[in-house]
């Protein structure tokens, strides 16, 4: 807390707070809920004043302590009489304000609020760079930090005509801003922004969006993109209170305000006081809510851009009577063309395969047997039944229906049924595969060797030899082919049949050769003898 012997310090703090009002909209600052202590010395007390150093209760005295306009300080005090205050110790505001209790709510206002500024400032842009102060005091614009006396220059010619009529009661501030993250590079003894006065906090809390009117001596100011309607003025304030600025800061002050405020101030017939629990975070959030007209205009522009594409959906609208009639005429014409196609002469190569007449491309035709036929020409060769879309059979390049084709099929020689599936041809006859078997053992002969007899009956090889093969004159067995062979080997001598193994000499049993040599057969009186036995029997007979 500042020393009671430096009243000029309080006066400077008040002016600095009002000038640096845009710093409250810095969204990066975090403020703790603290209450400012009661001042021991009246900040407006000068050498000739007799006011008490204690804060007055809510009434006319409190109204004189409330500063409603930027730069409203007593006329008798000038900037030359105010010495530079010492900087407050770091963390002082947080230490003594944490134990203070909240005061009771203020009584109803008896007088109206001061007049609203002539121009409302928009909402703040991104947070400004950190300044050299440690609270919500004056934020020195760029280029004005080189000298200590520059912030005090615009305070020399300031009038305070509307300060006594300010109806705002001075109750203690709830929040005291923390020092900014970046500290000043100047030494603590040269800091020109002291701690804020206790009566400045209620004004900041009750009028968070109150804007500062621009000085009349300024030239042309840059206009903002979005200018909201001005706040309705209060009837109890004086419109003539102005704050003339020094030439050195006249161009910097409005520029900083125009660049930091972009949201409109709340408009109404009378500004209502905010409750004590109104925080700086809420003050920062309100301009964001009022920035919604800008995206609304963009959305309206987008709708206007999309409107041309959304207007012409005429295709989805119902057809008119004229369009319906045109569609009906086109449909009737199409159906007539389909029912009565125009005659088209066919090429000379496209001839009917039966009547040899030309085919029209518009007439239906049947392609079968690698030829084109008229529908009426493609019929059964036997019964002349139309075969379009029906199953037919090709017999010698002639179409037959199923019934007529069955009459042309072969009949099985065994079962006497028509062969419509697989057929076997043997001995000049047709057989079903299952019907072509041996007549003796009924073994299927499909794919096997068979022999037919004189009655044209098929026999397997074994049954045929057993039934028709010659028999051996020695063993009386049928002479059959050896196993694994298809040829039958037999020896015929003296009109007799012999197996090879049975062709021997009857007297000595010596195998005889089939050749005409000395080992061959020398028959005698119907006996098969070898040469030796033949000689013996011949000598005996003599």
From Swiss-Prot:
SMART domains: LIM. GO terms for biological process: cell adhesion; integrin-mediated signaling pathway; transforming growth factor beta receptor signaling pathway. It comes from the Eukaryota. Residues 102-131 have a biased composition (Pro residues). Residues 352-411, 412-471, 472-538 form the LIM zinc-binding domain. The keyword Transferase does not apply. Residues 300-309 have a biased composition (Basic and acidic residues). It is found in: Cytoplasm; Cytoplasm, Cytoskeleton; Cell junction, Focal adhesion; Nucleus. InterPro entries: Znf_LIM. Residues 22-319 are annotated as: Disordered. Keywords: Cell adhesion, Cell junction, Cytoplasm, Cytoskeleton, LIM domain, Metal-binding, Nucleus, Repeat, Zinc. GO terms for cellular component: cytoplasm; focal adhesion; nucleus; stress fiber. Adhesion plaque protein. Binds alpha-actinin and the CRP protein. May be a component of a signal transduction pathway that mediates adhesion-stimulated changes in gene expression. This is Zyxin. It comes from Gallus gallus (Chicken).
